[in-house]
């Protein structure tokens, strides 16, 4: 029996007779499609930075803001998202977010500097909803399979993120869509995802008594919790590191002699290298009483990749890129796992997710713009 079959069988126990294996499968498919939209609209930007700068005549600092704006949106909106999910329902808020994501991607692809930044801000707000609510949704729907389901949605998120960075240049140049088409094409994915999420909502089996009980039991001041701040700091550091790489790795590699297609491909290699670990690490972490050893491995991988890329042999670029990718897989997976492992219920998981992503992405937002300023 496959891992996914085990999830469906295990989580199907205890559900009403009208909701069975099909409803669990639809929930999994819905989560996979939502997760697929959480990185692709962002990772597609990195290989296009040079084209955008040349087309609309902006500085490196302003180009860095294209990546920074979504992070600021994450930081500002994340604390509000759990409250919206609690008041109106997680599924409905996620539906609204994917609609706004489609609109934001479309606006970003229009002509002009203003539309570029307005659309980017809108899609950032939309993505923050999925970022915050998915960990809590997984804890609610799959409490006995948090590690496995975290791996499933992490794989989807990072796979499509890798694809987006790798195909941006071919779409822009090979298909002659330009940078606007290369960024705008991801609106098709978000539009399709709306229908899959609607199908999931139709078969949703949310028990209101359980939801109300969680509301009553989840009044914990996370902002005064040392553990919550540890999770937040870890989230912020890994996010800052990741988004600096997404925004500027292609430009760094071009300065080392790679062309646009090759540098975009290297970004894809990094994102693909982390894929298996975004699945493996949550499963392993979920079976461990503590995760400090995994955090240590993460730090070592980041150090090897960073110093190798900056000071190591250019002949070993692929090795440094893979080390960074594996480290990113460890870091991201652990961040998402901590939201579920360090809380009692789905609402607390959403609130910790909101706190960590708010403060964490505020730290992360400094990275791309600061790097662009130094680069100028």
Question: Where do the language-model regions lie?
Answer:
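Helix-loop-helix hairpin linking two adjacent transmembrane segments in secondary transporters
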Residues: 113, 144-145, 149-205, 248
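A late C-terminal transmembrane helix in Major Facilitator Superfamily
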Residues: 343-376
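Extracytoplasmic gate region of multi-pass secondary transporters
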Residues: 45-46, 224-268, 273-278
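Cytoplasmic helix-loop-helix junction between adjacent transmembrane helices
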Residues: 119-155
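C-terminal transmembrane helical hairpin of 12-TM major facilitator-type secondary transporters
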Residues: 289-338
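Helix-to-loop junctions at the C-terminal end of transmembrane segments
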Residues: 77-89, 277-290, 375
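Conserved MFS/SLC helix-loop-helix module at the cytosolic interface between two early adjacent transmembrane helices
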Residues: 76-114
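Juxtamembrane intracellular "pre-TM" segments in multi-pass secondary transporters
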Residues: 9-21, 202-231
């Amino acid at each position: 029996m496959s891992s996914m079959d085990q999830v469906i069988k295990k989580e199907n126990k205890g559900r009403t007779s009208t909701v069975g294996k099909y409803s669990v499968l639809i929930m999994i498919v819905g989560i996979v499609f939502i997760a697929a939209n959480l990185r692709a609209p962002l990772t597609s930007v990195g290989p296009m930075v040079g084209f955008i700068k040349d087309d609309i005549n902006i500085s490196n600092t302003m180009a860095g803001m294209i990546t920074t704006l979504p992070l600021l949106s994450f930081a500002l909106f994340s604390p509000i998202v759990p409250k919206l999910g609690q008041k109106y329902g997680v599924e409905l808020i996620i539906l609204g977010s994917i609609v706004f994501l489609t609109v934001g991607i479309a606006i970003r692809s229009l002509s002009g500097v203003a539309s570029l930044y307005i659309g980017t801000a809108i899609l950032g707000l939309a993505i923050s909803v999925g970022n915050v609510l998915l960990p809590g949704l997984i804890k609610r729907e799959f409490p006995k399979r948090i590690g496995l389901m975290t791996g499933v949605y992490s794989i989807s998120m990072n796979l499509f993120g890798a694809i987006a960075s790798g195909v941006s240049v071919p779409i822009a140049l090979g298909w002659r869509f330009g940078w606007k088409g290369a960024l705008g094409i991801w609106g098709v994915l978000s539009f399709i995802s709306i229908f899959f999420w609607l199908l999931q909502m139709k078969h949703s089996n949310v028990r209101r008594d359980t939801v109300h009980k969680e509301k009553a039991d989840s009044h914990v001041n996370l902002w005064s919790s040392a553990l919550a701040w540890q999770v937040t700091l870890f989230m912020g550091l890994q996010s800052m590191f990741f988004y600096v790489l997404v925004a500027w790795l292609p430009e760094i590699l071009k300065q080392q002699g790679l062309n646009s297609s090759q540098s975009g491909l290297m970004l894809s290699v990094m994102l693909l290298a982390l894929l298996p670990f975004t699945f493996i690490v949550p499963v392993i972490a979920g079976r461990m009483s503590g995760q400090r050893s995994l955090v240590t491995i993460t730090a070592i991988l980041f150090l090897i990749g960073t110093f190798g890329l900056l000071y190591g042999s250019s002949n070993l670029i692929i090795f440094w890129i893979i080390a960074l990718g594996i480290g990113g897989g460890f870091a991201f997976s652990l961040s998402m796992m901590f939201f579920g492992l360090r809380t009692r219920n789905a609402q607390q998981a959403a609130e910790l997710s909101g706190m960590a992503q708010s403060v964490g992405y505020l730290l992360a937002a400094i990275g791309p713009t600061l790097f662009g300023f130094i680069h100028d």
